[in-house]
Amino acid sequence: MRLIQSEIENFPYQRLKKAAHMTAVEAASHMGAGCSGAAFNVLSGNDEPLDEFEPLVARLRQTRAFYDLMARHLGRAQPIGLYTAWNKDQAAAGDFINHPGWAMGHLGQGSQILEAGLPAAYQAQGSAVTLLFPQSVAAMSPEEIRKALAGGVYTDVETLNLLNQLGYQELTGMTAEQPHPVDCIEEFTAHPLNGPFARRQRDCRQSFYRVSGYVGYVLKKSDPKVETLARLVDYSGKELSSCSMATYENKLGGRICVSGYYPWDHLHSLSKSAQMKSVMRWLARDRLPAYVASYHKVNLWVREPKSGRIAIALLNASFDAADGLDLAVATSAGEARVFDMQAKEQVIRASNTDGPYRRFVLPAVEPWTMRLVVVGACEASF
């Protein structure tokens, strides 16, 4: 499909309710996520002068060149990265258990992972990692479940239990026992995926945030190849769980990481965001096309057009400027073209190499502003 339009609707069309800048950013983010353009439903329907909307229309006109660049370089290639395993059959799965709200309850739970600078994907085909939820499993065929478990999966205990109940324990490698609903603190082990953050702690304050399914669990290894990334201790330092987060490589060659303590929340500390990026690289076997290696709050959409070019749309999702934003790109190219929202171009060189990734430190990105980064010598086409 060549044209996938999104609608930017500023209902109830009162100018002070939404900034012109954010309206322009919203359209660009939709294009980054896969749309080929945007239709703007932003003007008043009343029989009155439209003078108050002139600044809004002017901003959209100023941003048109950036939209054109995005359409040209992103083309119709699909975003590659972390797939949240949503499908349209989940609503029916919720109805089947007489709990219709359950089917969509996970939507948005993966947002904190994606906000740390990991690329989003919206289809299983071509995705590098699957973020798996019980709602997803309930609406997947056995073949789809096995295919996911033969790739890279990050998940929680609720999903682990469901997978095991369905007979996939040989592929998950572990079980969950002894839930601890209070006074747990996550402590990182000296595992290589934790890098320099061994013994760092993450306290999610269970007494404040009583989130269903987020109690601290003891993960039991059903295969000795399971490796421990974190344990749980209480406020006195006493161990409550010798294993609360673990990784496993199964007989299909798939890799799985299970977190038994706030797997989708409270992920934005330096140590935890760094750990999650290392975990996602491991799960993907370094097939992530790009990610933000520095400590910034950034949303990322990455495409690989057929020409071999990598095109990246990124959003600084913070009210602070992103200085020193370090973008890791799976490429052998030594230069990247960076376009701001005024369509001004800068060419930057890779600062260093990290395995299959070249690292590019971008010029400062203003708060809640986007960039288009293009790496590779071939012209994109669509």
Labelled PLM ranges:
Residues 236, 337-358:
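Solvent-exposed beta-strand/loop surfaces of large extracellular or lumenal domains
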Residues 152-155, 353-382:
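C-terminal beta-strand-rich structural cap/linker in extracellular carbohydrate-active enzymes
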Residues 136-208:
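A glycine-rich, often tryptophan-bearing local segment used as a flexible ligand/cofactor-contacting loop or short
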Residues 1-108, 185-217, 229-233, 237-250, ...:
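Hydrophobic targeting/anchoring helices
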Residues 118-128:
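Short acidic low-complexity segments
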Residues 223-231, 309:
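Short, hydrophobic/aromatic-rich segments at coil-to-beta transitions
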Residues 309-317:
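Short, well-ordered beta-strand segments enriched in hydrophobic/aromatic residues
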Residues 321-347, 372:
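Beta-strand-rich binding/interaction modules
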